[in-house]
């Protein structure tokens, strides 16, 4: 589910950003300035793939650990972090009012996240307060993971440029 969502972003982002940069600048100048300052308009598809690989490895390790140890609250934290991410993508699409390179798979995977949440709440021994706590943990981990992914992406981008293999 996560990778399906990430593939849309990796495959579509570079072309989308190229085609929509002026529109972003016109309608969302602060967002465009933020992206420009960080050089994200220049990132290659392979640079975005590095970020996706980073996220996938972390998600897989936490999920494997959760199942192996029976510590399903960690899986719940990952589910909630990803679900909140999808709701943010949905809000971005509603605000932008045009295709963004995450919306198709957001609409396809969000129902699964809702279904998994309902099933988890039906079978868990976690209290509602504990689920809120694990949701906060999931959001915090997702944010930290995002920062570290962009750090790795910036390193990879510089490596690409230095070697002249930037696409």
Regions found by a protein language model. Name each.
Residues 32-54:
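Interfacial helix-start motif at the membrane-water boundary
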Residues 3-10, 82-93, 141-155:
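Transmembrane alpha-helical segments that form the membrane-embedded catalytic/substrate-channel core
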Residues 114-167:
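Terminal transmembrane helical module of multi-pass membrane proteins
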Residues 10-40, 155-167:
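Cytosolic, membrane-interface loops and tails of multi-pass inner-membrane proteins
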Residues 77-78, 94-108, 128-135:
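Non-cytosolic membrane-interface motifs at loop->transmembrane helix junctions
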Residues 67-72, 90-100, 124-125:
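Membrane-interface helix caps and helix-loop-helix hairpins in membrane proteins
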């Amino acid at each position: 589910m996560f990778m399906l969502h990430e593939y849309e972003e990796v495959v579509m982002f570079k072309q989308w950003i190229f085609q929509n940069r002026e529109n972003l600048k016109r309608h969302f100048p602060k967002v465009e300035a933020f992206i420009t300052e960080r050089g994200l308009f220049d990132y290659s598809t392979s640079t975005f793939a590095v970020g996706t690989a980073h996220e996938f490895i972390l998600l897989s390790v936490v999920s494997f650990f959760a199942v192996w140890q029976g510590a399903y609250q960690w899986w719940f934290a990952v589910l909630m972090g990803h679900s909140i991410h999808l709701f943010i993508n949905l809000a971005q699409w509603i605000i932008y009012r045009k295709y963004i390179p995450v919306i198709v798979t957001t609409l396809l995977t969000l129902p699964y996240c809702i279904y998994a949440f309902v099933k988890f709440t039906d079978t868990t021994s976690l209290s509602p307060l504990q689920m809120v706590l694990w949701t906060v943990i999931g959001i915090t981990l997702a944010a930290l993971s995002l920062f570290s992914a962009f750090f790795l992406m910036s390193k990879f981008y510089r490596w690409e440029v230095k070697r002249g293999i930037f696409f």
